[in-house]
Structures are given as structure tokens and as C-alpha cells.
Amino acid sequence: DRSLVGSEMCIRDSYWIACIRECFEECGVLLAYRENGNLFGASDTEETKILASYRDRLNNGEPVLLELCKELNLKLAVDRLAYVSHWITPKMEMKRYSTRFFIALAPSDQKAIHDGSEGVESTWITPENAIKGGEKGNFPIILPTIRNLEAIVGFTSTNELLENKIKCQSEVSSIEPKFFMKDGKMIG
């Protein structure tokens, strides 16, 4: 439904919309604009209850994003996302995925809260500290996450990072790691 993003939709937009849906489902942040063009933030208790209800329904597998946008007169803020990478699970894996990664500038008046299912714990941390924490074994961190974090180390602000990545979106290519046996160990 083109009314969801307020512009001509193309196949590419479906990934941006899916990213916004996942963000809302997994951490409760909804990237959207109000009818007046302002960035959405739940402005009262009633809107907060509506959001919680839709998030619960989304977490139960109901496709409710369009319904939510219509009820609150919202347009998804696809322009606040930048496409960072596209990872494809190696052929040797039984379950394969084709996953696109994005970055976004979170609205200042929305609080991210993990869903307790896909995300069971959350913290704000710099990319450098996330990489170090993973290396030390403080928390699990997988190869795509490590590489995505390495790609954003060195930016001085989220705005700078977002602007840079928006300019480079056409340069994103697919990554499919290759693994092989060497000296009895799987390496890639």
C-alpha cells in the first residue's frame, strides 16, 4: 500500500518497510511521521496503549503495521533508514537466510524496550565496546554483527553515520561467507 510510505513504492521499499516493522516488533521503536510531517512519538497515554496493543499483536504474528498506520494517520519514515549490508547464510548451513541490515536515527522521545523473545537483553554501547565485549565473551556476537560494527567504528555521531550511509546505499553488495576445513578446523 503506497499510502504507508507516502511516495512511489518499489521493491526496494519492501525491505525498508520490513526493517521498520522489525524495529517496532523487537524493540518497540516506530519510525513514522505524523500527518503534519513531525516525527512520531506517543504523545499521550492513549497512544501508548494503542502502540503496546499493536506491538503485542505483531509479536503474535498478526500483520498489523498498515492498520496501525491508518489508525494513527502515520506514514513510515523510510527516509530515516540507511541500508548498510546484505548477508547471505553460507551454503553449508541447513537454514539459510538473506538478511539486510540497516541503521536508523532513533526518535528521541521513544524508548527502546527489547521484546523478551528475539531480544532478551539490551544496552546502549559504542561499536568499539560491542566488538571488545564480544571478543572477551561478555555476550554472543556473530560474524555479520562484528563486520557491521567494524564498518561504523570511527563515526563521531549517529547523524554523521546516517548521512554517510545514505550517500553510499547504492554501493552495498551481497556478502556470502565461504568456509573450508584447514588443519581440522573450519575457517572462513
Tell what function each PLM region has:
Residues 1-6, 10-11:
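Single conserved hydrophobic/aromatic residue that forms the stacking wall/gate
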Residues 8, 41-42, 46-188:
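Nudix hydrolase/Nudix homology domain
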Residues 19-20:
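Short, well-ordered alpha-helical segments
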Residues 23:
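Hydrophobic alpha-helical positions that pack around
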Residues 29-32:
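Residue-level markers of secondary-structure register and packing in elongated scaffolds
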Residues 35-37:
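Short glycine/proline-centered loop/turn elements that form peptide/ligand docking sites
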